[in-house]
C-alpha cells in the first residue's frame, strides 16, 4: 500500500484525524477559554502587521482541538525533565504515551509526554545494538513512533498504514530498534505530527561509537532540544481538529524553548569546551543558533561526522535536523545562546534583525583543564568518513536519475488572502525565519492548501509518484524549489530508512560532506543529493514541516533486495 492511500489529502483517515477526540464544545479548561463562539481564539498578531480587510471574525475552516478537554489538569502528573536511559544490546524499555501537566510562560496546560517526561527519555545505546521498545498508548489519539534517521528494519519505521497500524488508545506495539550508525537521532509520532509533536511527543536517541576518539576532547556534553510553541494570554492556541491549520507556512511558535524550558540557563568555566547535541523539533521554525562571543566548531550532523571539523559563526538547523558542535567559552561573563535571524515584514516590505535568547551561559573565572582547551584548536580530519564516502565519488558528476520540483496549489482560501498573496513580490526570500503573516497562515488549512512534490519526468505528484530501486543502487536526485509559486517556502526534505549526501546547492559543490537524513532546501534553490539505497522496504520522502506533510507533501518509494 502506498502512502497516498493512508495520508489522504484533507480527510486524513481515522489514524490521522482528531475526530474521535472530544471537541471543544464538550468542555473547556479555564486557561483555554474562548473568545469566539466557534471555540477559536484569535491568533496573536504583531502590531506592525495589520489584519487584512475582510478577515475580521474569520476563523479556520476546521474545528479547534485541545487535548484533555474533559480532564482536570490537577489530576495529571506534572511533566518531569528528560532522563538518561542507558541500554545495552537486547535491553528492553517500556514507554507510555500519556497526558501530562505543563506550565509554560506562566500558563498551566495539558500536554503529552513519553513516560511523563518533556522531552521524552534520552535513550542511549551502543552502535550496532538492537534495543526493544514496548510502547503503550494511553491517550485517545492513535499514535506511532518513528525512529528518525535510524536505518531501521522497515516494519519498525512507524508509518501508519505502511509499516504498521497506528497504536490506538489502550493498545501497545513493540519496536525492535537496531542502530547501525553512531550519532544523535530522535523519535516522534507519525500521526498528526502537527499536534502530537507540538504537544511534547519527542525524545532523543544517542548512539555511541566504540571508538573512544570518535569525537575530539571535550570537558562535558549537553543535549539541547530546540522547540517553540504558539501561545496567547490564555495559553497554547488550539490546533485544527479535522486537519492542520497554518498550512501555508507551518505553525511557528512565539515562545521558544530549550529542553522544554523558556528560561534555560547553564554554567561553564573559563576555557571549558562543551559539546552540544542540537535537535530541532519545532513544527516549522528553522533556527540560526549563535553562541555569542564563544568559539564554535561544527563536528557532525544527522548520520555521521563531517569530513573535517570547521569553525563557524552560527548553525542553521531546520526542523528534524541534528548537529553536533563543540563550543569553547573563552571569557568569563554571560554568553547568550540565541536564535539570530533576519525577519521579514511582508506588509511593510521590510527586513529587520531579530535576536531571541534560547539559553544563558554564565562563565566563571575558574579555569577548565587547559589540555582539553588547547586540543579544541585542532580541526580534526575524519578520515573514516572520507573513506566511507570515497566509493560514491564516481557518481557525483553524473546526471540525476530523478528530478523533483516543489510547488503549492490552493482552493477555497479567503479572497482577501489570495489577493494579498498574489500582489506580494517578497515571497522569494530564501528562508522564512518567522511567521510574517500570522492571520493568513492561521486561516489556511490542509483542506484548502496542497503542498506538492512533482516528478518532472512523469508529472506525477505526491502519492502518485512510484519509484522502485534495488538494494545497492546509488541514486542521484535533483530537487528544485520554485520561487514563483503561490507561496514559495523553504522545505526540510526528509528521506526515511536511507542516508544521503548533499552534493551541491545551486551548482556549488559541497566541500565538506556529511551523511544526512534531512536537508533544508531554500526558496529558489536547486539541491543535488546522492542516496545510498541500502535498506529494503517501502519508505517515505516528505517535507518535515508538519503542516506541509499533512497538506500532501509526501510520497513513498520501494527498495527491494536483488534476486540471488
Question: What are these model-derived regions, one by one?
Answer:
Residues 10-20:
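Bacterial N-terminal signal peptides
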Residues 28-94, 98, 197-231, 307-474, ...:
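Extended terminal and domain-junction accessory segments
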Residues 118-125, 147-181, 216, 258, ...:
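Extracytoplasmic beta-sandwich strand-turn segments characteristic of Greek-key/jelly-roll folds
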Residues 135-139, 278-282, 479-483:
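Asparagine-centered strand-capping/turn motif at beta-strand->loop junctions
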Residues 171-214:
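Hydrophobic or amphipathic alpha-helical targeting/insertion segments
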